[in-house]
């Protein structure tokens, strides 16, 4: 079975990992313990702080407007971009995910509406407290399906000095938040690539979930997906049950590798950094060209090590870090 064999030489392990197994992994356990023992991931020095920028909302493209038409006509879209501006959404539910993260569900203006947010897109949130001179504006990526009706969901991690995340964590059902979108990111379409890799840290997982969910929900999309997800502790692994469900349901097309800075004693996954050695072992090879796409999303330190940072919200900047050293081209990598 994929990455569940006894430790083997690096070359054999690399060949083994790049094949997707024909049998499902056992539920409730790590499928990658032997892999991490074999590659010996290095230690991680401290937590990351995640902050992303966004560019102004733009009118939806023709591709983006093809969101799930229903019998009797196309669905209504809450976010249309362009000159729409911010819309005020009512918080319907606030659920605790872990010690510093909540899932917030906002009602769309009409119960039969869909968000209108294309796969990989984000929104801008705005809040001005009573003692603030200027409003706080932050981007967030929804985790709900693009065709979900009536509501839109966000996973929000609270940061000690984060005014928007703190405000959203303090919100009670019935309160409202100004939201604008979409902010287009990578223009995804089914089967655009044969194999994609999602390299994420912390709440950088949200656009990765949105992308993976769209792939596996579409029976016509046969894309293979590899997830490499770094966190501080096991409880910080967001959407872990959902990722495990995908791994058990699509064992030939999806694999997840988790790396923890502060793992429990029983942890069989990776420990410390997401290393160059791990990426070399589990990612699709760069020689595959356009068939392969690598997505990166996480805190600044992770970008610096793995891909180099973005020059601006609208400029991907040059490729650097481990991915460049491993032979990937700039066109094969997208930084959220």
Swiss-Prot record:
Pfam families: FAD_binding_6, NAD_binding_1
Organism of derivation: Phaeosphaeria nodorum (strain SN15 / ATCC MYA-4574 / FGSC 10173)
GO molecular function: cytochrome-b5 reductase activity, acting on NAD(P)H
Required cofactor names: FAD
Catalytic activity annotation: 2 Fe(III)-[cytochrome b5] + NADH = 2 Fe(II)-[cytochrome b5] + NAD(+) + H(+)
Protein encoded by which gene: MCR1
Protein name listed in UniProt: NADH-cytochrome b5 reductase 2
Keyword Mitochondrion assigned: yes
TM regions (residue ranges): 28-50
Keyword tags: FAD, Flavoprotein, Membrane, Mitochondrion, Mitochondrion outer membrane, NAD, Oxidoreductase, Transmembrane, Transmembrane helix
Subcellular location: Mitochondrion outer membrane
Entry keyword annotation includes Mitochondrion: yes
Family: Belongs to the flavoprotein pyridine nucleotide cytochrome reductase family.
């Amino acid at each position: 079975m994929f990455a569940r064999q006894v430790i083997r030489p690096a070359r054999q392990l690399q060949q083994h990992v790049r094949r997707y197994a024909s049998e499902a992994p056992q539920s409730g356990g790590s499928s990658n313990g032997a892999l991490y023992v074999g590659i010996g991931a290095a230690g991680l020095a401290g937590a990351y702080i995640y902050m992303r920028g966004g560019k102004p909302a733009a009118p939806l493209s023709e591709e983006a407007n093809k969101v799930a038409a229903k019998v009797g006509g196309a669905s209504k879209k809450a976010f249309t971009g362009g000159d729409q501006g911010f819309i005020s959404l009512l918080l319907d539910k606030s659920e605790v995910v872990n010690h510093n993260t909540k899932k917030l569900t906002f009602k769309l203006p009409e119960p039969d509406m869909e968000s209108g947010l294309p796969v990989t897109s984000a929104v801008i949130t705005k809040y001005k407290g009573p003692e603030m001179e200027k409003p706080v504006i932050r981007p967030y990526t929804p985790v709900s399906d693009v065709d979900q009706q009536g509501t839109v969901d966000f996973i929000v991690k609270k940061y000690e000095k984060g005014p928007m995340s703190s405000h959203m964590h303090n919100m009670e059902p019935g309160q409202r938040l100004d939201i604008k979108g979409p902010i287009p990111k990578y223009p995804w379409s089914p089967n655009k690539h044969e194999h994609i890799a999602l390299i994420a840290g912390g709440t950088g997982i949200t656009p990765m979930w949105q992308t993976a969910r769209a792939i596996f929900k579409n029976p016509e999309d046969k894309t293979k997906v590899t997830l490499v997800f770094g966190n501080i502790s096991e409880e910080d692994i967001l959407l872990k049950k959902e990722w495990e469900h995908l791994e058990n349901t699509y064992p030939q097309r999806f694999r997840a590798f988790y790396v923890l800075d502060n793992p429990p004693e029983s942890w069989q996954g990776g420990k410390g950094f997401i290393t160059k050695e791990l990426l070399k072992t589990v990612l699709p090879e760069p020689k595959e060209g356009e068939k392969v796409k690598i997505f990166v999303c996480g805190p600044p330190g992770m970008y610096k090590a793995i891909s180099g940072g973005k020059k601006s919200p609208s400029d991907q900047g040059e490729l650097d870090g481990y991915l460049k050293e491993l032979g990937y081209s700039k066109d094969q990598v997208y930084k959220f």
